[in-house]
Amino acid sequence: MMLVVSENYLLSPSLYLKALKLCSYQNVKKQLLLIHGNSITNGFCSNLQLKDMLIDLYLKQGDVKHARKLFDRISKRDVVSWTAMISRFSRCGYHPDALLLFKEMHREDVKANQFTYGSVLKSCKDLGCLKEGMQIHGSVEKGNCAGNLIVRSALLSLYARCGKMEEARLQFDSMKERDLVSWNAMIDGYTANACADTSFSLFQLMLTEGKKPDCFTFGSLLRASIVVKCLEIVSELHGLAIKLGFGRSSALIRSLVNAYVKCGSLANAWKLHEGTKKRDLLSCTALITGFSQQNNCTSDAFDIFKDMIRMKTKMDEVVVSSMLKICTTIASVTIGRQIHGFALKSSQIRFDVALGNSLIDMYAKSGEIEDAVLAFEEMKEKDVRSWTSLIAGYGRHGNFEKAIDLYNRMEHERIKPNDVTFLSLLSACSHTGQTELGWKIYDTMINKHGIEAREEHLSCIIDMLARSGYLEEAYALIRSKEGIVSLSSSTWGAFLDACRRHGNVQLSKVAATQLLSMEPRKPVNYINLASVYAANGAWDNALNTRKLMKESGSCNKAPGYSLVY
């Protein structure tokens, strides 16, 4: 419905105000400009009430330019005018403008009051501007607002948000009386800085002093419960919230579902979710993520996703990304394609880096390399994981040359590879026998990029060298990493198997000795060593190794036999 503006009706400020209220209900920017122009024509724009309402509506429309012009035309601007404008900027989220206006106010030598400080400190907090906030704190201490509850509360909120909990606690302890905002800011600050125990202690003190918590308090405490992974605390907080009358709060239910999922109780999370009439995006996302991490619960995740589509619940890229990860886990590229198609048709879903990476990963791990490449090339922005996922996909499916080409392109575009990128490349080299190039890549990782080799990297390079018969070189690498990186039994097993195939008795004994110290009851270790001895004609040693296997109490292995006799 459009607002009809006529000069015959807009004859007084009160009628202009009524017309502006209609604009605020209908969010009509065009009509707002029309009424503003009409008020100027008829000489009513100097009316302060009308001007204030115009400023508010312009800011709600995101039109900072017109709002600021109106403010600049106020002839006599006192502390009330400045504070009102700073407060509007802060309340509407225009925090840089609020800070800029506060500085102008200071230059014009207008003294701030507690409401000015409260608003500008809120902007500092939301922007994370600790330096500016501390400067304003200095002005507070010099003035007469230092003991004001609003100002103290704003200061501790700023320090808590910026991780300065000691300074926040000083403000908190110096307050003669504390409101709920102050308690919540402290509890949330401790939670955000991983001081969960202090959050719980402060909550106990809050209850002791007779302060009633709200949904925000419970939200912070539930996040603290996630930090310590304590299901018992989540249940206790749930019970207390119901007792205090917050059991039906949708915000609290969201927090509880998330906490139950992350503390390992999918059953309680599901029960809460099922009890709500309206499906909530955050709750659904938390449940889908939780179910995706349980191998036997993937069907439940699909049920929730289908339920969201049926009930037309708002969808986002996080949900779609989680569903694609499930498709990757269960190797269902068919369902993955359907979800991809749904995402393409939806106007709600933004194809961000995380979603693009999930698509690359799903298609690459399912062997659909062409689709993985298409998803990669269509991404507007890519991170190191995007490149690494496709490199790993090429390597996994034997496209070694393309993996190297993509790595070279990555280097050319100055995307810094990480340890997983090099692990994918080394794995590809190992499986395709590209020993020389693999060694060069390993050297690049260590000396050019300064990435320390993990056990997985060493396992790849040792396996690659050993497969190609470079047993001495592989063992030299093992020796050089003694005391730095502990090799797994699977790495030693691969090395022993390579030694056996290449008939190197001496290094077979070294590998077998290491394996037997790690897994003394595993028969395959004895059998491999005995096979090496037998292949080299050392029958006595082979027999002794078999005896050792029996004496160790290893699981019995059925003896080999022939049908020819």
Curated annotation (Swiss-Prot):
UniProt cross-references to SUPFAM superfamilies, sorted A to Z: TPR-like
Annotated PPR repeat ranges: 12-46, 47-77, 78-112, 113-147, 148-178, 179-213, 214-248, 249-279, 280-315, 316-351, 352-382, 383-417, 418-448, 454-484
Entry keywords, A to Z: Repeat
Membrane-crossing residue ranges in chain numbering: none
GO biological process: RNA modification
Pfam families documented for this protein: E_motif, PPR_2
Repeat among keywords: yes
Database matches in InterPro entries: E_motif (IPR046848), Pentatricopeptide_rpt (IPR002885), PPR_At4g14850-like_plant (IPR046960), TPR-like_helical_dom_sf (IPR011990)
Chain residue ranges for the region called Type E motif: 491-565
Family: Belongs to the PPR family. PCMP-E subfamily.
UniProt-recorded name of the protein: Pentatricopeptide repeat-containing protein At3g20730
Native source species: Arabidopsis thaliana
Gene: PCMP-E94
